[in-house]
């Protein structure tokens, strides 16, 4: 598609996105080449239609009338947009996994993810997002919920998986998710799978 023809298709696609949605260059690669996409996004940013969060990452910002300012994008949404741009599979790990699973109320100082891509670290205002490479078997071919729970269990450590933790994880999962996890987590480290079997209650 010629560059002169790509503005309306890109702008139209963005206008159909919900407020707060984050998007990246690759989301429009079927409409134009990267250079043309960047020009369109730069023009839309200049017109105040979109917000540039960081290089190559944009959103349709949500305005909070009460605060009189735009709402900051959620770090997890930024992380997944970056991953989508590179074609990575990512899963929250460490304190990030604990926070997202409701096992910790502490907001992570660094939003940390395991990834099947290269190691990368990004600074977005006051937000630090870090991707660590890991073995594919820990994150591929399993559901995002199973992968998240494996990482949360690993972050806590064997001795800190109490009955309270097990019950909290149960409460954060559906019956179908536990059935899937019982099957998907078979190749996790043995002690982690033992804890997952407790969570799943021997689901089959």
Annotate each PLM feature:
Residues 1-3, 203-204:
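N-terminal intrinsically disordered, low-complexity, charged/polar
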Residues 2-81:
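Short beta-edge/loop segments at beta->alpha junctions of small alpha/beta modules
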Residues 37, 93-94, 145:
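Amphipathic alpha-helical interface surfaces
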Residues 53-56, 83-125:
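Short gly/ser-rich loop at a beta-strand->alpha-helix junction or flexible surface loop bordering the NTP-binding
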Residues 71-74, 82-89, 141:
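Alpha-helix N-cap/loop-to-helix boundary motif
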Residues 81-82, 93-95, 155-160:
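Positively charged, aromatic-accented nucleic-acid-binding surfaces
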Residues 123-133:
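A short, charged helix-loop
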Residues 133-204:
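Hydrophobic alpha-helical interaction segments
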């Amino acid at each position: 598609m010629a560059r002169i023809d790509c503005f309306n298709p890109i702008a139209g696609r963005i206008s159909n996105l919900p407020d707060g949605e984050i998007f990246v260059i690759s989301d429009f690669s079927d409409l134009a080449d990267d250079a043309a996409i960047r020009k369109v996004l730069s023009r839309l940013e200049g017109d105040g239609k979109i917000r540039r969060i960081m290089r190559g990452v944009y959103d349709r910002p949500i305005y909070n009338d009460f605060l009189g300012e735009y709402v900051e994008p959620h770090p997890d949404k930024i992380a997944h947009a970056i991953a989508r741009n590179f074609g990575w599979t990512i899963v929250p790990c460490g304190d990030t996994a604990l926070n997202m699973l409701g096992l910790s109320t502490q907001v992570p100082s660094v939003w940390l993810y395991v990834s099947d891509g290269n190691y990368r670290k990004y600074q977005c205002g006051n937000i630090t997002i870090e991707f660590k490479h890991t073995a594919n078997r820990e994150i591929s071919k399993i559901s995002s919920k199973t992968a998240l729970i494996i990482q949360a269990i690993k972050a806590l450590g064997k001795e800190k998986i109490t009955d309270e933790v097990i019950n909290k994880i149960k409460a954060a999962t559906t019956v179908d998710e536990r059935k899937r996890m019982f099957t998907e987590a078979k190749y996790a480290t043995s002690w982690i799978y033992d804890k997952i079997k407790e969570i799943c209650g021997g689901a089959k």
